[in-house]
Amino acid sequence: MATLERKLVEMLKAPVEALGHELWGLEYIQAGKHSILRLYIDNEKGIFIEDCAETSRQVSAVMDVEDPISTEYTLEVSSPGVDRPLFTAEQYQLYIGETVKVQVTMPVAGSRNLKGTVIGIEGQMLTLSVDGNELIIALDNIRKGNLIAKF
């Protein structure tokens, strides 16, 4: 996770939790002059559109005061959904035995895109079973990780 994203998580975690939600994670996507700040919120009851709207208003107020992003950006708030993104070691731990897709910065076993079963997590190292091979991947090397939904 980049330094700005860490700072944003620290800044926004308490306001989101005050509304009764968990800040599942966030993505800051720079797209030229206009960027996107995407927050994922969750709770045990599920997330409804009203929850997203209320969280958006609260987060906007905090962002206006703190002003951590100097360029224009669009704020998006949503639930993680069934193909939820995974950001932390704790989140990968929740999905041991499940299938995930990860994109890595530095190739692992010759690939930047991997799909496999979460075997375990130790510290900041994720173990995936990919095509029968166990691969160990540093969480810092994961650009993006998502749960693959079962239907």
Curated annotation (Swiss-Prot):
Transmembrane segments: none annotated. It is found in: Cytoplasm. Its main location: cytoplasm. Keywords: Cytoplasm, Ribosome biogenesis. GO terms for cellular component: cytosol. GO terms for biological process: ribosomal small subunit assembly; translation. The keyword Membrane does not apply. Pfam families: DUF150_C, RimP_N. It comes from the Bacteria. Required for maturation of 30S ribosomal subunits. NCBIfam families: PRK00092.1-1. PANTHER family: RIBOSOME MATURATION FACTOR RIMP. This is Ribosome maturation factor RimP. It comes from Shewanella piezotolerans (strain WP3 / JCM 13877).
